[in-house]
Amino acid sequence: MAHACLQQVGLKSRSLQIAGSLSHGDKRRLEIAIVLASSAEVILLDEPMAGMSVENVPELVEIIRSLARTHHKTVLIVEHHMDVVLGLADRIAVLNFGELLICDTPEKVIANPTVQNAYLGEVL
């Protein structure tokens, strides 16, 4: 099972490496492989794109998308990069100092004037 999970995230060829010797992006993939091996139905990913090089983000987005769809997992992502969130989420909750501003579809969130003013100026 471990090798199958590593293969799904593109790490099968590195299965004998020590985790500490992996690149930051590969460590993120390893974290997701560990999640795949678990029986958890709900997965929390805290800033999964943090420290990732720009060229590796799309691949990690696809791995996370696969985790949700192929493996029927609910994935809760804490992420500050709205462009990444918009590409992944079915629903988005926007918090401001612990207050829930909105929880809705990506389309409705980006159309919300409060969210546009506070968070999306550079994305839109």
Task: Show which residues each predicted segment covers.
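Glycine-rich phosphate-binding loops of nucleotide-dependent enzymes
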Residues: 1-124
